Structure formats: structure tokens, C-alpha cells
Amino acid sequence: MSGAVLLCLFFSINVGNIQWDLRYIPILLAFLYGGKRAGWGVAAIAVVGRIGQGGDLFLLGVVLIVLTALFYALCVNRFYMLPPRWSRIRYASLLVILPATIQTFGTLYLINYENHLSESWVAGWLYIVFLVVTVVLVTYLFETLLEKERIVAELVATEKDFTKGELAASIAHEVRNPLTVVKGFVQLLSEDKQHAEYHKLILSELDRAESIIYEFLNTTRPQTNATFHLNETAREVVALLTPYAQERSIQLTIGTCEQAIVNGNENKVKQALMNFVKNGIEASNEGDTVTIQLDRLKDRAQIEINDNGVGMSRQQLKQLGTAYFTTKESGNGIGTMVSIRIVEMMNGMVTFKSKPGKGTKVVLSLPIEKENE
């Protein structure tokens, strides 16, 4: 994108003092598909290129590039929450129209072409239309390529899940049998009071091993989907975990939105929500509040879980969701991995934001069932 923005600047069409170019397209695409860091990098290169060009209106051009980059940085998060392809294409088109319109007609007003004012305005409108058409075509290409990558990734994941499911079921069966036998004999020996503590420890570890097997199997079992009300599910989770929070002097609050009906496995969604909320409770300090906020963004439902706990470093965030990684004194990290997988199997998405000592935000995004809107 850095090279593209320079090409757009130096291979522009100049009519009098007006420079017609496509500089905003590489900047926009860098923000949308590369993130804020890439977007600001491309914008900085565009500023350097515009200064190098000089001209009577170079200062205005620099200011417009900076303001446009700031505008894109503020709007880019919304783009990530939109479903792929057409919703994103429409949003990208709107993002390019505003700065292009301000630049085009603002420049025309400042220059005030008295002799060819009507022709300049026509040229301005044609320029904006050309920008929008170009953005639509380029964004469509990006979205098509990303969609193909997603399809290939899903096919590979499905094949892996099938193989993993068969292997997991076989391993679980073979491991559970000796565990059951050992557990039975330990329970018989528990009458020996002399070693009662040892018996409790053994039983506890056997229960933990069985729990790990159960959680691992959950990642491979196919889902039975049905429509359900996400607000009600979230309220049930809060009701179930309120006593657990009160034991630790933690307050749970929930804010719901207009009714959001989603299609999926309600029990598994409840399991995922309980895991994330429980993690927030366990990471919080006495007297803290854990908030659960539901919002509806067009055709997606969003659940935010915020805590003011210990937080996580950037390195810990990268490892989050991998098996056997946990920031807690006890636990194995499989619960978080399973919860993320549950949401992803519903075409949803889980994102984490956290800083050490400043708490953690977990955002779940799920598609809303269109037939029931």
C-alpha cells in the first residue's frame, strides 16, 4: 500500500491548481485490511509524498490526508464487526465519499474557478463517482480473496475436527476405563482413616483428569442448533454465577439490548458465557464489578464482558485460547479454548483487550437469525 499511495500521488491528473488522484484508496484499504498501524504508516508516506510534490495547495493536501487518516482510524473498528462482503463494501464506499467530497468541493471553493466553475463541479462529481466505483471493485476483490481463504480454512478445520473427533473418542474410551476402575478401588479403600487425605487427593486428581477429557471431547462433538433468545441466556448465566461472585464480594451487572435471536446450541453458548464471566470474577479483586453488556449491531449481536482485574500482557493475549495456557493458579486453559471454538462454530468471533492491572474486555460477536427478525 505504501508504493500504491506514492503512485497515486505522482501519477495524478492536474488541472490548473487542482490535483485529481486516488490517494485515499490505499490509505483506506490499509486501515481496513492492515489495521491502524498499517493505516497510519501509509498515511505518513502519503504526507511525505505530498510535501515532496509541493505546489500552492500542498499544505491543504497534507491537512486533508491527516484528517482523513484520523477519520478512518475512528471508523475502522465498526468495519471489523460487519459481516463479510456486501456490508463491508457499502461501508468502505461511505468512508471514501466523505473525505473525497470535502477535498474536491472545498478545493474548488477556495480556488473559485470563475470562468469554468460548472465544468469543474462536473469534474468533481465524476471524480467522486470514479473513487466510489474503484473502492467497490477493490474491496470486492479483497473480500472475495478473504472469503476463499475462509472457505479453505473451514474445509481444513472440518477435516481436522473429524479426524480429531475419532481420535479423541477412541483415546477417551481407552483412558476412562482404567480411570473408572482405579476410582472405584480408591473409593473402597477410603474407609482407611489413616490415609484419608491421600484418598481425597487421588479422587480429586481423578476427577480433574475426567474433567479434562470431557472438555477435550466438547471441542470435537457436532452441535445441535436451534434458535434461542440471547438476552435470556445471558440473564440465566448471571443468575447462576451471582452466588459464586457474592462469595468473593464481586458484583455482577448486566445490560441487555432489544431482542436478539440467534441460531446455535444454547447450552454450549451458555457454557462459553459462563466460562468467560467466571474468568472475569476470578481475575477481579474484592469489591470489583464485572459487567455484561449486550448490544445489537444490525445483523449481529455483541456481548461485552468487562472486569477490573489483574489484566494480561500482550504476550499473554497472544497465547490465550491455546490448550494448557492459563493465567490462573489452577486450571488448564482448555475451558477458554473450548469457549472460543463454540463461538467460532456459530460463525461468531471472540476478541480480547487487556492491559496488566487494568482489567480485561472480552467481546463475543454472533450473527442474528434473520428469519426471526
Curated annotation (Swiss-Prot):
GO terms for cellular component: plasma membrane. The chain crosses the membrane at residues 27-47, 57-77, 91-111, 122-142. SUPFAM superfamilies: ATPase domain of HSP90 chaperone/DNA topoisomerase II/histidine kinase, Homodimeric domain of signal transducing histidine kinase. Residues 170-370 form the Histidine kinase domain. It is a multi-pass membrane protein. Its EC number is 2.7.13.3. It is an enzyme of class 2 (transferase). GO terms for molecular function: ATP binding; phosphorelay sensor kinase activity. Keywords: ATP-binding, Cell membrane, Kinase, Membrane, Nucleotide-binding, Phosphoprotein, Transferase, Transmembrane, Transmembrane helix, Two-component regulatory system. It is found in: Cell membrane. The modification Phosphohistidine is found at H173. It holds the Pfam family HATPase_c. It comes from the Bacteria. It catalyses: ATP + protein L-histidine = ADP + protein N-phospho-L-histidine. Involved in a sensory transduction pathway that enhances the production of minor proteases. This is Sensor protein DegM. The gene is degM.
